[in-house]
Swiss-Prot record:
Keyword terms of this UniProt record: Cell outer membrane, Membrane, Signal
Chain's gene name: lptD
Principal subcellular localisation of the protein: membrane
Highest classification ranks of the organism: Bacteria, Pseudomonadati, Pseudomonadota, Betaproteobacteria, Neisseriales
GO cellular component: a single term: cell outer membrane
Similarity annotation: Belongs to the LptD family.
Entry-linked PANTHER family: LPS-ASSEMBLY PROTEIN, LPS-ASSEMBLY PROTEIN LPTD
Name of a matching Pfam family: LptD
Protein name according to UniProt: LPS-assembly protein LptD
Length: 802
C-alpha cells in the first residue's frame, strides 16, 4: 500500500501497511523515500463504492419501511484509519500510486484522500500538486462536514472546496434538517455552497421519494441559509402537482421571504383557496399577505404583521372581503391587534382591539364555539403596576374598555357598560400572623341606552393565619363600602347612593394522613375536613344600579366564596357555615396525585337572601343542596372526572357531569363525557331574557390507529333534548413509515343556530422539514378531541406513553 502526505510545496511519499504480506511493500517504500515515485499493491482498505443512481428512490406512497429506521444513511465513505495529520496536509492512500513529487500523483485502487475535514474515496484519482486539485472516477464518494456526495466523476480543489461532479447523489444534514438530491451535474462553489443541474431533492430518508421537487437547477448556500430553484415542479407519489418558474426556500429552518404553501378547504361556502406570501422584514418583524377566494363569496384578502422586541411584542390581523356575493354585503372585514409593552420591571401596558364589519360575521365564517364566545368584542387599553409601597406589596391598574356587541339572529343586542376608565389598586402587608390590606376601585360606567355613572369601591380588611402541619384557622374582618354618582337618564334623576357592609368569615381545615397500598403500590392517603363560616348582614340594594354583577353557578368551589355574585354591585347576605371534606391519594414515591374527591354542603342560620335585582327576599331553607366532585389520573393512561349538584329536597340531581379518558400511548385516545343540567341557559331571546331548558349532551371522541400508518379521528356530540347532533367530525390521517410525509382529510358538520348547520371538509399535507399544505389539523382537533396529537408529530414508536 502506498501513502502520500503533502503540505505545499513539499511532497513526501511514504509506505505503511498492516499484515504479513505487506512487509515487502514497506521495505521498498523505505528504500525509495527520496525517490519522486512510490508504488505498491495491497488489499482493499474500504468497501466498494456503490454505483450512483439518478433516482431518489421509490415513489410508492404507502410502502412500509421494514428497517424501522427512518434516518438510516448508507455508510459510503471510509477513512484511512491512520493517525491524524496536521492542518492543511493532504494524505493519499491507495493500492497503487505513481507520479512525480511537486507535480502530479496518480492513485488507483481503493483510493482514500484526506485533508482537514474532507475525505474522498474513489476507484482512481489524479492529484495535481500545483493546483491542489484532485480528479477522481469511475465512482467516488466525498464526505465533508455532514455532507456526502457520490457520483461518477469529480474534479475538486481541496483548498478552495470548489469543483464539479457528474451523475451525483448528495445527502446532507445540518441542525437536524436532512436534504438529499440526485443531479446530472453538481458544482461546488465553496464550503456549503452548491449548484445542482437537472436535479431532484427532498427531505426524506435515503431511498424514499414519496415526494420530491424536480428542478432544472438549484443553488444552495448554507452560509446564507437559502436555496433557489428554477423551473421547479412539486411531485407527489410520482405525479407532478405544482410548477413554478422560480422558488426559494430556507435550508436551516430560519425565516425568509417567499411564497408559502397554499391552503385549500371545502364547505358550505364552496371551495376556498388561499395563497400566502411571507415577508421576513427584519429579525424581529415579519408579515404575511394571503390573497384568496371563497367559492360562493368571492375574493378575500388576509394580512398579518408580527413584531417582537425585548420590551414589547404584538400582532395585528386583518381579513377583508371587498364584496360578499352570498350575503350581498360589501367591505366585510375582521380586525385584531394585540400588544404588550414592558415599560419597566414594575410597569406594563397593552392593547387588545377586536372589530368586525357586521353582527353576522362570526355566524358566516366561524363555528358555533366562536359564535358563542364572541358576542362582545373587546377594545381595551391597559396599564398595570406591580411593586412595593408603604412596606407592603401594591398591585394597581388603569384600563379603558369598550365593546363591539354583535346582535343575535333576532337582531337583539345585550350591550355591557363601557369602562371609561377603571382604576384599581390592591395593597397588602404581612405583620406576624396578620395581614392587613385594602382594595379600591374607581370606575366610570358609560352606556348609550341605560343610566350610567361612576362607582367607587373601598374594601379594607385584616386576616390572620394560624397554620401548622396538620391544620389551619384563618379569620378575616372587612368593611365593604360602595359609593355611586349616577347621571340623569330619561325620567331618572341624577343622584348619589352608597352601601356599607361589614364582612366576617373564618376558614379552617385539618389534614389527616395515612400510608397504605393502592393501585399496586404504596400511597399516602389524606382526609381533609374544612369549615367556612361567613357573615354579611342583609341590606336592600334595589336602589343601586347593576353595572356588572351576575350570579355564579353553585358548585363545590362556591361553598368557600365570600360573595356569591360576580362584580361589586350586588353583595349577598350571609350567616352560613360550609362543611366539606375531601380526600386525596398521592403516589408514595413521587408525590404525584392519583385521586381526589370531595363533598360538601352549606348550612344557613337565616333565610334572608339578596336577589339579583337588589331586593331582599326569603328563602326558607336550613341547608343547601349537596355538591361533590371526583377526579383521578391513574398514571397517564386513565383520566376520570365527575361533579354533581344534588337537590336533597326534591331528591334529584340539578346538574352533573362525568367524563373518562383512556390514553395508553401517543396517538391513542378514547374520550367520553356526559353533561346534564335541569335548568340551564340555552340562548338569549329577542326580548333580552334567556331561554332556560333542560340540557343533556353526550360527547364522544377518539383518535386511534387502524394500521401502523393510518389513524382515525372522530367526534360525536349529541343533544338529547334537541334530538340532534351538535357536532359530527370524522377524519383519517396517514403518516409514511419513514416519517417523510403525513396527510389527513376531515369532514365536519356543526350547529350554528337553532335550525342552521354548517358543513366543512378540509385536508392537510405535511412534508418533513419543508412545509405544510392545507389547514393545520391541530387548530381544530385538540379542542374536538382532548389529548389529540397530529399523526405527523407522533414518534416512530406508537407505543410510547404520553
Amino acid at each position: 500500500m502506498a501513502r502520500l502526505f503533502s503540505l505545499k510545496p513539499l511532497v513526501l511519499a511514504l509506505g505503511f501497511c498492516f499484515g504479513t504480506h505487506c512487509a515487502a511493500a514497506d521495505a521498498v517504500a523505505a528504500e525509495e523515500t527520496d525517490n519522486p515515485t512510490a508504488g505498491g499493491s495491497v488489499r482493499s482498505v474500504s468497501e466498494p463504492i456503490q454505483p450512483t443512481s439518478l433516482s431518489l428512490g421509490s415513489t410508492c406512497l404507502f410502502c412500509s419501511n421494514e428497517s424501522g429506521s427512518p434516518e438510516r444513511t448508507e455508510a459510503a465513505v471510509q477513512g484511512s484509519g491512520e493517525a491524524s495529520i496536521p492542518e492543511d496536509y493532504t494524505r493519499i492512500v491507495a493500492d497503487r500510486m505513481e507520479g512525480q513529487s511537486q507535480v502530479q500523483v496518480r492513485a488507483e485502487g481503493n483510493v482514500v484522500v484526506e485533508r482537514n475535514r474532507t475525505t474522498l474515496n474513489a476507484d482512481w484519482a489524479d492529484y495535481d500538486q500545483s493546483g491542489d486539485t484532485v480528479t477522481a472516477g469511475d465512482r467516488f464518494a466525498l464526505q465533508q462536514d455532514g455532507t456526502l456526495i457520490r457520483g461518477e466523476t469529480l474534479t475538486y480543489n481541496l483548498e478552495q472546496q470548489t469543483g464539479e461532479a457528474h451523475n451525483v447523489r448528495m445527502e446532507t444534514e445540518h441542525g437536524g434538517r436532512r436534504l438529499q438530491s440526485v443531479s446530472r451535474t453538481a458544482e461546488m462553489l465553496g464550503e456549503g455552497h452548491y449548484k445542482l443541474t437537472e436535479t431532484q431533492f427532498n427531505t426524506c430518508s435515503a431511498g424514499d421519494a414519496g415526494w420530491y421537487v424536480k428542478a432544472a437547477s438549484v443553488e444552495a448556500d448554507r452560509e446564507k441559509g437559502i436555496g433557489v430553484a428554477k423551473h421547479a415542479a412539486f411531485v407527489f407519489g410520482g405525479v407532478p402537482i405544482f410548477y413554478t418558474p422560480w422558488a426559494d426556500f430556507p435550508l436551516d429552518g430560519n425565516r425568509k421571504s417567499g411564497l408559502l404553501v397554499p391552503s385549500l378547504s371545502a364547505g358550505s361556502d364552496g371551495v376556498s383557496l388561499s395563497v400566502p406570501y411571507y415577508f421576513n422584514l427584519a429579525p424581529n418583524l415579519d408579515a404575511t399577505f394571503a390573497p384568496g377566494v371563497i367559492g360562493e363569496r368571492g375574493a378575500v384578502f388576509d394580512g398579518q404583521v408580527r413584531y417582537l422586541r425585548p420590551d414589547y411584542a404584538g400582532q395585528s390581523d386583518l381579513t377583508w372581503l371587498p364584496h360578499d356575493k352570498k350575503s350581498g354585503r360589501n367591505n366585510r372585514y375582521q380586525a385584531k391587534w394585540q400588544h404588550r409593552h414592558d415599560i419597566s420591571d414594575t410597569l406594563q401596558a397593552g392593547v387588545d382591539f377586536n372589530q368586525v364589519s357586521d353582527s353576522g360575521y362570526y355566524r358566516d365564517f366561524y363555528g358555533n364555539k366562536e359564535i358563542a364566545g364572541n358576542v362582545n368584542l373587546n377594545r381595551r387599553v391597559w396599564l398595570d403596576y406591580g411593586g412595593r409601597a408603604a412596606g407592603g406589596s401594591l398591585n394597581a391598574g388603569l384600563s379603558v374598555l369598550k365593546y363591539q356587541t354583535l346582535a343575535n339572529q333576532s337582531g337583539y343586542k345585550d350591550k355591557p357598560y363601557a369602562l371609561m376608565p377603571r382604576l384599581s389598586a390592591d395593597w397588602r402587608k404581612n405583620t406576624g400572623r396578620a395581614q392587613i390590606g385594602v382594595s379600591a376601585q374607581f370606575t366610570r360606567f358609560s352606556h348609550d341606552s341605560r343610566q350610567d355613572g361612576s362607582r367607587l369601591v373601598v374594601y379594607p380588611d385584616i386576616k390572620w393565619d394560624f397554620s401548622n402541619s396538620w391544620g389551619y384557622v384563618r379569620p378575616k374582618l372587612g368593611l365593604h363600602a360602595t359609593y355611586y354618582s349616577l347621571n340623569r337618564f330619561g325620567s331618572q334623576e341624577a343622584r348619589r347612593v352608597s352601601r356599607t357592609l361589614p364582612i366576617v368569615n373564618i376558614d379552617s381545615g385539618m389534614t389527616f394522613e395515612r400510608n397504605t397500598r393502592m393501585f399496586g403500590g404504596g400511597v399516602l392517603q389524606t382526609l381533609e375536613p374544612r369549615l367556612f363560616y361567613n357573615y354579611i348582614p342583609a341590606k336592600s340594594q334595589n336602589d343601586l344600579p347593576n353595572f356588572d354583577s351576575s350570579e355564579s353557578s353553585f358548585g363545590y368551589g362556591q361553598l368557600f366564596r365570600e360573595n356569591l355574585y360576580y362584580g361589586n354591585d350586588r353583595i349577598n347576605t350571609a350567616n352560613s357555615l360550609s362543611a366539606a371534606v375531601q380526600s386525596r391519594i398521592l403516589d408514595g414515591a413521587t408525590g404525584e396525585e392519583r385521586f381526589r374527591a370531595g363533598i360538601g354542603q352549606k348550612f344557613y342560620f337565616k333565610n334572608d337572601a339578596v336577589m339579583l335585582d337588589g331586593s331582599v327576599g326569603k328563602k326558607p331553607r336550613s341547608r343547601s343542596d349537596w355538591v361533590a366532585f371526583a377526579s383521578s389520573g391513574i398514571g397517564s393512561r386513565f383520566i376520570l372526572d365527575s361533579s354533581i349538584h344534588y337537590n336533597q329536597n326534591d331528591k334529584r340531581a340539578e346538574n352533573y357531569a362525568v367524563g373518562a379518558s383512556y390514553r395508553p400511548a401517543q396517538g391513542k385516545v378514547l374520550n367520553a363525557r356526559y353533561k346534564y343540567g335541569r335548568n340551564e341557559k340555552i340562548y338569549l331571546k329577542s326580548d333580552g331574557s334567556y331561554f332556560y331548558d333542560k340540557l343533556s349532551q353526550l360527547d364522544l371522541s377518539a383518535q386511534w390507529p387502524l394500521t401502523r400508518n393510518l389513524s382515525a379521528v372522530v367526534r360525536y356530540n349529541y343533544g338529547f333534548e334537541a334530538k340532534k347532533p351538535i357536532e359530527v367530525l370524522a377524519g383519517a390521517e396517514y403518516k409514511s413509515s419513514c416519517g417523510c410525509w403525513g396527510a389527513g382529510v376531515y369532514a365536519q358538520r356543526y350547529v350554528t343556530g337553532e335550525n342552521t348547520y354548517k358543513n366543512a371538509v378540509f385536508f392537510s399535507l405535511q412534508l418533513k422539514d419543508l412545509s405544510s399544505v392545507g389547514r393545520n389539523p391541530a387548530d381544530r382537533m385538540d379542542v374536538a378531541v382532548p389529548g389529540y396529537i397530529p399523526a405527523h408529530s407522533l414518534s416512530a414508536g406508537r407505543n410510547k406513553r404520553p
